[in-house]
Amino acid sequence: DMEDPYITYTSKYMETVWWLIKQIYNKDLMYKGYTIQPYSPKAGTAISSHELNQPGTYQDVTDTSVTAQFKIINENLPDFLDNKEDIYLLAWTTTPWTLPSNTALTVGSKIEYVLIKTYNQYTYKPIEVILATDLIQKLFSGNYFEVSHESELLEFESKSNKIPFYISNKFIGKDLLGLKYEQLLKYALPAENPENAFRIIHGDFVTTSEGTGIVHTAPTFGADDALVAKQAKPQIPPMLVKDKNGDLVPLV
């Protein structure tokens, strides 16, 4: 209606929006939550989808990815993981600056995973890790080679050019759900319900096309992360901490 358009900066429009919000509030349909929104540090405001679709906004860039080790808490483990050795989950991320805000690890319930026994390529100490079966060749290539028997691992010497690895067990992501792990960077805890953090959850977005099949999850920063955290039962809390005014703010 070009003769009578609505214009967002007019008093009539703004008063109408506030009236609608009041009706929603009076019907007890409004609640306080936390969502992930594009934000402009320069403008100090959220950014609309229209602004994000302006020419030149999106660019193809090369990301640096990180594979981090998360240590499983050795309590009430399923039989296929119940041993006396430390086990680490290999989680992949292209946003390593969000690792201090990690509160969950996400797997695919139907994806097949493996427990691998090998040696740390930096310390040459024995280590056991979990990752997706389909990504073994991507992560364990170059300096690594597979052996058929666990006993062959004992033949490894730190001066060797090649590091052996042995597939100890196979299972699906569903078997890992609910397992707890140690917080990676212990700077702070979520201000609310920290006891529900640092556990393995399911996410439909997890694939085996790249990474490890285990996704570092920081609900404070990622839209997908925030969604799966809210869908988890109980919900995964975001890494929000209280500032000097007692307000919950992201840990950056």
Task: Please provide the spans of the model-predicted regions.
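Conserved alpha/beta enzyme-core scaffolds, especially Rossmann-like or related mixed alpha/beta domains
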Residues: D1-A46, D60-I72, T93, I200-G211, ...
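Non-cofactor substrate-recognition interfaces
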Residues: D1-T8, D79-L89, P96-V252
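Polar, glycine-rich mid-to-C-terminal structural blocks
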Residues: L29-M30, Q59, V66, F70, ...
